[in-house]
Amino acid sequence: MAEQISSAKAEARTVRIAPRKARLVIDLIRGKSVAEALAILEFTPRAASPIVEKVLRSAIANAEHNYDLESANLYVSEAYVNEGATLKRFRPRAKGMASPINKRTSHVVVVVSEKND
């Protein structure tokens, strides 16, 4: 018989926030219950918070809808940010010069799993 699936995943790819900044927020929720993680994200004043919150809510919805998991029993088992494509731009400087500007993007991944009590 097939093994029961007990985790669900959600990804946001090519999000316009630097991975270094997104990792500060992702590190706060790893290992927490989903209710606690949502509360943390709601009150964290960082630009990455709404993005990570949206991905977390998507992972919870995937768990409930696709795998019939109970949201009260879920916790954030994996949460990480990988580097996406970098948009390269130039800022004009004095005397006809230009400085490079790297607009970094991120791939945000959140996996929620059922607690084994």
Swiss-Prot record:
Family statement drawn from the similarity comment of this UniProt entry = Belongs to the universal ribosomal protein uL22 family.
- At the top level, the lineage of the source is Bacteria
Q: How does it assemble?
A: Part of the 50S ribosomal subunit.
Q: Tell me, what does this protein do in biology?
A: This protein binds specifically to 23S rRNA; its binding is stimulated by other ribosomal proteins, e.g. L4, L17, and L20. It is important during the early stages of 50S assembly. It makes multiple contacts with different domains of the 23S rRNA in the assembled 50S subunit and ribosome. The globular domain of the protein is located near the polypeptide exit tunnel on the outside of the subunit, while an extended beta-hairpin is found that lines the wall of the exit tunnel in the center of the 70S ribosome.
One of the GO BP terms on file:
translation
Q: Which GO terms describe its cellular component?
A: cytosolic large ribosomal subunit
Pfam families (UniProt xref): Ribosomal_L22
The region annotated as signal peptide is: none
Organism, scientific name: Lactobacillus acidophilus (strain ATCC 700396 / NCK56 / N2 / NCFM)
Database matches in InterPro entries: Ribosomal_uL22, Ribosomal_uL22_bac/chlpt-type, Ribosomal_uL22_bac/org-type, Ribosomal_uL22_sf
Q: What is this protein called?
A: Large ribosomal subunit protein uL22
Q: Which UniProt keywords apply?
A: Ribonucleoprotein, Ribosomal protein, RNA-binding, rRNA-binding
Task: Spell out the molecular function terms from Gene Ontology.
Answer: rRNA binding; structural constituent of ribosome
